[in-house]
Amino acid sequence: LHMIHLHWYQYPPMNPMMYPLLLIFMLFTGILCLAGNFVTIWVFMNTKSLRTPANLLVVNLAMSDFLMMFTMFPPMMVTCYYHTWTLGPTFCQVYAFLGNLCGCASIWTMVFITFDRYNVIVKGVAGEPLSTKKASLWILTIWVLSTTWCIAPFFGWNHYVPEGNLTGCGTDYLSEDILSRSYLYVYSTWVYFLPLAITIYCYVFIIKAVAAHEKGMRDQAKKMGIKSLRNEEAQKTSAECRLAKIAMTTVALWFIAWTPCLLINWVGMFARSYLSPVYTIWGYVFAKANAVYNPIVYAIS
Protein backbone atom coordinates (compact mmCIF):
# COMPACT_ATOMS: atom_id res chain seq x y z
CA LEU A 1 0.00 0.00 0.00
CA HIS A 2 2.86 2.38 0.71
CA MET A 3 3.84 2.21 -2.99
CA ILE A 4 0.41 3.33 -4.27
CA HIS A 5 0.13 7.02 -5.13
CA LEU A 6 -2.59 9.04 -3.38
CA HIS A 7 -4.05 9.99 -6.76
CA TRP A 8 -5.58 6.52 -7.13
CA TYR A 9 -7.47 6.62 -3.83
CA GLN A 10 -10.06 9.03 -5.23
CA TYR A 11 -11.42 6.38 -7.60
CA PRO A 12 -13.87 3.61 -6.64
CA PRO A 13 -12.96 -0.02 -7.34
CA MET A 14 -13.22 -1.02 -10.97
CA ASN A 15 -16.34 -2.76 -12.21
CA PRO A 16 -15.94 -6.47 -11.27
CA MET A 17 -16.82 -7.42 -14.86
CA MET A 18 -13.60 -5.77 -16.05
CA TYR A 19 -11.45 -8.47 -14.50
CA PRO A 20 -12.96 -11.49 -16.33
CA LEU A 21 -12.81 -9.54 -19.60
CA LEU A 22 -9.19 -8.67 -18.98
CA LEU A 23 -8.40 -12.25 -17.98
CA ILE A 24 -9.95 -13.63 -21.19
CA PHE A 25 -8.12 -11.04 -23.28
CA MET A 26 -4.77 -11.86 -21.66
CA LEU A 27 -5.38 -15.60 -21.97
CA PHE A 28 -6.07 -15.22 -25.69
CA THR A 29 -3.12 -12.91 -26.41
CA GLY A 30 -0.79 -14.84 -24.11
CA ILE A 31 -1.35 -18.17 -25.86
CA LEU A 32 -1.10 -16.60 -29.32
CA CYS A 33 2.08 -14.73 -28.43
CA LEU A 34 3.90 -17.63 -26.77
CA ALA A 35 2.95 -20.08 -29.52
CA GLY A 36 3.63 -17.67 -32.38
CA ASN A 37 7.01 -16.50 -31.15
CA PHE A 38 8.10 -20.02 -30.17
CA VAL A 39 7.30 -21.26 -33.68
CA THR A 40 9.14 -18.27 -35.18
CA ILE A 41 12.26 -19.00 -33.12
CA TRP A 42 12.10 -22.74 -33.82
CA VAL A 43 11.64 -22.32 -37.59
CA PHE A 44 14.43 -19.76 -37.98
CA MET A 45 16.86 -21.71 -35.81
CA ASN A 46 16.16 -25.08 -37.44
CA THR A 47 16.01 -24.03 -41.09
CA LYS A 48 19.52 -23.67 -42.46
CA SER A 49 18.53 -21.36 -45.30
CA LEU A 50 16.97 -18.93 -42.81
CA ARG A 51 20.00 -18.70 -40.54
CA THR A 52 21.25 -15.45 -42.06
CA PRO A 53 22.71 -12.43 -40.21
CA ALA A 54 19.58 -10.35 -40.89
CA ASN A 55 17.35 -13.08 -39.51
CA LEU A 56 19.30 -13.07 -36.25
CA LEU A 57 17.53 -9.78 -35.60
CA VAL A 58 14.18 -11.42 -36.34
CA VAL A 59 14.99 -14.18 -33.84
CA ASN A 60 16.01 -11.59 -31.26
CA LEU A 61 12.69 -9.79 -31.79
CA ALA A 62 10.79 -13.04 -31.30
CA MET A 63 12.82 -13.82 -28.16
CA SER A 64 12.15 -10.42 -26.59
CA ASP A 65 8.43 -10.73 -27.38
CA PHE A 66 8.34 -14.28 -26.02
CA LEU A 67 10.14 -13.25 -22.84
CA MET A 68 7.77 -10.31 -22.38
CA MET A 69 4.65 -12.44 -22.48
CA PHE A 70 6.26 -15.34 -20.58
CA THR A 71 6.99 -13.02 -17.64
CA MET A 72 3.92 -10.74 -17.91
CA PHE A 73 1.20 -13.27 -18.74
CA PRO A 74 1.08 -15.47 -15.57
CA PRO A 75 1.20 -12.59 -13.03
CA MET A 76 -1.52 -10.73 -14.92
CA MET A 77 -3.73 -13.82 -14.81
CA VAL A 78 -3.23 -14.11 -11.04
CA THR A 79 -3.97 -10.45 -10.36
CA CYS A 80 -7.09 -10.55 -12.55
CA TYR A 81 -8.33 -13.59 -10.64
CA TYR A 82 -7.85 -11.92 -7.24
CA HIS A 83 -8.81 -8.41 -8.48
CA THR A 84 -5.64 -6.95 -6.94
CA TRP A 85 -1.85 -7.30 -6.88
CA THR A 86 -1.02 -10.23 -4.56
CA LEU A 87 2.60 -10.93 -5.50
CA GLY A 88 4.33 -8.47 -3.17
CA PRO A 89 6.35 -5.28 -3.65
CA THR A 90 9.57 -6.97 -4.78
CA PHE A 91 7.98 -8.90 -7.60
CA CYS A 92 6.05 -5.76 -8.56
CA GLN A 93 9.39 -4.09 -9.28
CA VAL A 94 10.73 -7.14 -11.10
CA TYR A 95 7.53 -7.35 -13.17
CA ALA A 96 7.78 -3.70 -14.21
CA PHE A 97 11.50 -4.03 -14.96
CA LEU A 98 11.02 -7.05 -17.23
CA GLY A 99 8.15 -5.37 -19.08
CA ASN A 100 10.22 -2.25 -19.71
CA LEU A 101 13.30 -4.27 -20.66
CA CYS A 102 11.52 -6.44 -23.22
CA GLY A 103 9.63 -3.49 -24.68
CA CYS A 104 12.83 -1.48 -25.06
CA ALA A 105 14.67 -4.43 -26.63
CA SER A 106 11.78 -5.05 -29.00
CA ILE A 107 11.60 -1.52 -30.38
CA TRP A 108 15.35 -1.19 -30.82
CA THR A 109 15.50 -4.55 -32.56
CA MET A 110 12.87 -3.22 -34.96
CA VAL A 111 14.99 -0.11 -35.48
CA PHE A 112 18.03 -2.20 -36.41
CA ILE A 113 15.91 -4.35 -38.75
CA THR A 114 14.74 -1.14 -40.42
CA PHE A 115 18.31 0.16 -40.63
CA ASP A 116 19.42 -3.10 -42.25
CA ARG A 117 16.66 -2.71 -44.87
CA TYR A 118 17.83 0.87 -45.41
CA ASN A 119 21.40 -0.33 -45.90
CA VAL A 120 20.38 -3.02 -48.41
CA ILE A 121 17.84 -1.04 -50.45
CA VAL A 122 19.15 2.53 -50.35
CA LYS A 123 22.90 1.96 -50.31
CA GLY A 124 22.84 -1.25 -52.33
CA VAL A 125 26.27 -2.55 -53.32
CA ALA A 126 27.85 0.53 -51.72
CA GLY A 127 26.57 -0.50 -48.31
CA GLU A 128 28.50 -2.83 -46.03
CA PRO A 129 26.70 -6.21 -45.91
CA LEU A 130 25.49 -7.36 -42.52
CA SER A 131 27.69 -10.11 -41.11
CA THR A 132 26.90 -12.56 -38.32
CA LYS A 133 29.47 -10.84 -36.11
CA LYS A 134 27.97 -7.41 -36.73
CA ALA A 135 24.40 -8.63 -36.16
CA SER A 136 25.49 -10.28 -32.90
CA LEU A 137 27.15 -7.03 -31.82
CA TRP A 138 23.95 -5.13 -32.57
CA ILE A 139 21.93 -7.58 -30.48
CA LEU A 140 24.39 -7.35 -27.58
CA THR A 141 24.24 -3.55 -27.75
CA ILE A 142 20.43 -3.63 -27.70
CA TRP A 143 20.28 -5.72 -24.53
CA VAL A 144 23.08 -3.93 -22.70
CA LEU A 145 21.64 -0.46 -23.32
CA SER A 146 18.08 -1.62 -22.59
CA THR A 147 19.18 -3.18 -19.31
CA THR A 148 21.10 -0.03 -18.35
CA TRP A 149 18.07 2.22 -18.85
CA CYS A 150 15.56 -0.13 -17.25
CA ILE A 151 17.66 -0.93 -14.17
CA ALA A 152 17.99 2.77 -13.26
CA PRO A 153 14.76 2.89 -11.16
CA PHE A 154 16.27 0.32 -8.79
CA PHE A 155 18.92 2.91 -7.92
CA GLY A 156 16.61 5.86 -7.27
CA TRP A 157 16.17 7.37 -10.73
CA ASN A 158 12.37 7.05 -10.77
CA HIS A 159 10.68 3.99 -9.21
CA TYR A 160 8.66 0.98 -10.23
CA VAL A 161 5.23 1.17 -8.55
CA PRO A 162 1.78 -0.47 -8.81
CA GLU A 163 -0.67 0.88 -11.35
CA GLY A 164 -3.86 2.41 -10.01
CA ASN A 165 -5.87 -0.65 -11.00
CA LEU A 166 -3.55 -2.89 -8.92
CA THR A 167 -3.26 -5.50 -11.67
CA GLY A 168 0.18 -4.47 -12.89
CA CYS A 169 3.23 -2.32 -12.18
CA GLY A 170 5.21 0.26 -14.12
CA THR A 171 7.23 3.45 -13.89
CA ASP A 172 6.17 6.21 -11.49
CA TYR A 173 4.70 8.97 -13.64
CA LEU A 174 2.74 10.69 -10.84
CA SER A 175 5.65 11.86 -8.67
CA GLU A 176 6.38 15.55 -9.18
CA ASP A 177 10.06 15.61 -8.21
CA ILE A 178 12.52 16.57 -10.92
CA LEU A 179 14.54 13.36 -10.63
CA SER A 180 11.56 11.09 -11.34
CA ARG A 181 10.33 13.22 -14.21
CA SER A 182 13.76 13.56 -15.76
CA TYR A 183 13.90 9.77 -16.10
CA LEU A 184 10.59 9.77 -17.98
CA TYR A 185 11.81 12.56 -20.28
CA VAL A 186 14.99 10.66 -21.13
CA TYR A 187 13.29 7.27 -21.33
CA SER A 188 10.50 8.58 -23.58
CA THR A 189 13.16 9.99 -25.89
CA TRP A 190 15.15 6.75 -25.83
CA VAL A 191 12.31 4.26 -26.43
CA TYR A 192 9.87 6.32 -28.47
CA PHE A 193 10.92 9.61 -30.06
CA LEU A 194 14.45 8.64 -31.15
CA PRO A 195 13.44 5.24 -32.61
CA LEU A 196 10.50 6.89 -34.35
CA ALA A 197 12.76 9.54 -35.87
CA ILE A 198 15.28 6.95 -37.09
CA THR A 199 12.52 4.76 -38.52
CA ILE A 200 10.88 7.64 -40.38
CA TYR A 201 14.26 8.75 -41.75
CA CYS A 202 15.08 5.26 -43.02
CA TYR A 203 11.70 4.68 -44.61
CA VAL A 204 11.61 8.05 -46.34
CA PHE A 205 14.79 7.10 -48.20
CA ILE A 206 13.65 3.50 -48.71
CA ILE A 207 10.45 4.69 -50.37
CA LYS A 208 12.41 7.15 -52.52
CA ALA A 209 14.85 4.43 -53.57
CA VAL A 210 12.06 1.97 -54.40
CA ALA A 211 10.17 4.61 -56.39
CA ALA A 212 13.30 5.56 -58.33
CA HIS A 213 14.09 1.91 -59.03
CA GLU A 214 10.55 1.16 -60.25
CA LYS A 215 10.59 4.22 -62.50
CA GLY A 216 13.93 3.21 -63.94
CA MET A 217 12.68 -0.32 -64.62
CA ARG A 218 9.56 0.99 -66.37
CA ASP A 219 11.56 3.41 -68.50
CA GLN A 220 14.03 0.69 -69.47
CA ALA A 221 11.23 -1.74 -70.32
CA LYS A 222 9.52 0.91 -72.43
CA LYS A 223 12.71 1.53 -74.40
CA MET A 224 13.05 -2.20 -75.03
CA GLY A 225 9.41 -2.49 -76.09
CA ILE A 226 8.41 -4.99 -73.38
CA LYS A 227 6.04 -4.81 -70.42
CA SER A 228 8.63 -5.40 -67.70
CA LEU A 229 12.12 -6.61 -66.99
CA ARG A 230 12.19 -10.06 -65.40
CA ASN A 231 15.85 -10.51 -64.64
CA GLU A 232 17.46 -11.81 -61.49
CA GLU A 233 18.40 -8.36 -60.22
CA ALA A 234 14.82 -7.15 -60.47
CA GLN A 235 13.54 -10.21 -58.63
CA LYS A 236 16.09 -9.73 -55.87
CA THR A 237 15.25 -6.06 -55.48
CA SER A 238 11.54 -6.92 -55.44
CA ALA A 239 12.15 -9.40 -52.61
CA GLU A 240 14.04 -6.79 -50.63
CA CYS A 241 11.18 -4.34 -51.14
CA ARG A 242 8.68 -6.88 -49.85
CA LEU A 243 10.81 -7.38 -46.75
CA ALA A 244 10.91 -3.63 -46.25
CA LYS A 245 7.11 -3.47 -46.40
CA ILE A 246 6.87 -6.25 -43.82
CA ALA A 247 9.29 -4.48 -41.50
CA MET A 248 7.47 -1.17 -41.95
CA THR A 249 4.12 -2.79 -41.11
CA THR A 250 5.57 -4.37 -37.98
CA VAL A 251 7.11 -1.10 -36.80
CA ALA A 252 3.82 0.72 -37.41
CA LEU A 253 1.93 -1.87 -35.36
CA TRP A 254 4.50 -1.58 -32.58
CA PHE A 255 4.12 2.19 -32.35
CA ILE A 256 0.32 1.92 -32.44
CA ALA A 257 0.53 -0.51 -29.52
CA TRP A 258 3.00 1.52 -27.44
CA THR A 259 1.73 5.05 -28.05
CA PRO A 260 -0.88 4.66 -25.26
CA CYS A 261 1.97 4.00 -22.80
CA LEU A 262 3.65 7.24 -23.79
CA LEU A 263 0.37 9.10 -23.40
CA ILE A 264 -0.23 7.55 -19.97
CA ASN A 265 3.17 8.71 -18.76
CA TRP A 266 2.78 12.25 -20.07
CA VAL A 267 -0.85 12.64 -19.00
CA GLY A 268 0.20 11.40 -15.56
CA MET A 269 2.87 14.09 -15.38
CA PHE A 270 0.89 17.04 -16.74
CA ALA A 271 -2.85 16.27 -16.65
CA ARG A 272 -3.38 13.57 -14.04
CA SER A 273 -7.03 14.53 -13.47
CA TYR A 274 -7.81 12.79 -16.78
CA LEU A 275 -6.04 9.59 -15.74
CA SER A 276 -8.28 6.81 -14.44
CA PRO A 277 -7.39 3.20 -13.48
CA VAL A 278 -9.31 1.79 -16.46
CA TYR A 279 -7.41 3.98 -18.91
CA THR A 280 -4.05 2.84 -17.57
CA ILE A 281 -4.82 -0.85 -17.56
CA TRP A 282 -5.99 -1.04 -21.17
CA GLY A 283 -3.12 1.10 -22.34
CA TYR A 284 -0.58 -1.36 -20.99
CA VAL A 285 -2.56 -4.44 -22.00
CA PHE A 286 -2.59 -3.37 -25.65
CA ALA A 287 1.11 -2.57 -25.39
CA LYS A 288 1.79 -6.15 -24.33
CA ALA A 289 -0.44 -7.41 -27.15
CA ASN A 290 2.05 -6.07 -29.71
CA ALA A 291 4.10 -9.17 -29.01
CA VAL A 292 1.40 -11.10 -30.89
CA TYR A 293 1.73 -9.09 -34.11
CA ASN A 294 5.34 -9.76 -35.03
CA PRO A 295 5.26 -13.56 -35.55
CA ILE A 296 2.05 -13.20 -37.58
CA VAL A 297 3.61 -10.62 -39.90
CA TYR A 298 6.84 -12.56 -40.35
CA ALA A 299 4.98 -15.85 -40.82
CA ILE A 300 3.21 -14.28 -43.80
CA SER A 301 6.60 -13.43 -45.29
Curated annotation (Swiss-Prot):
Organism, scientific name: Procambarus seminolae (Crayfish)
Matching SUPFAM superfamilies: Family A G protein-coupled receptor-like
An annotated GO BP: phototransduction
Entry keyword annotation includes Transmembrane: yes
Record-given protein name: Rhodopsin
Top-level taxonomic group: Eukaryota
Protein task: Photoreceptor required for image-forming vision at low light intensity. Can use both retinal and 3-dehydroretinal as visual pigment. Light-induced isomerization of 11-cis to all-trans retinal triggers a conformational change that activates signaling via G-proteins. Signaling via GNAQ probably mediates the activation of phospholipase C.
Keywords: Cell membrane, Cell projection, Chromophore, Disulfide bond, G-protein coupled receptor, Glycoprotein, Membrane, Phosphoprotein, Photoreceptor protein, Receptor, Retinal protein, Sensory transduction, Transducer, Transmembrane, Transmembrane helix, Vision
One cellular component term from this protein's GO annotations in UniProt: cell projection
PTM remark: Contains one covalently linked retinal chromophore.
Subcellular location: Cell projection, Rhabdomere membrane
Glycosylation sites: 165
Mode of membrane association: Multi-pass membrane protein
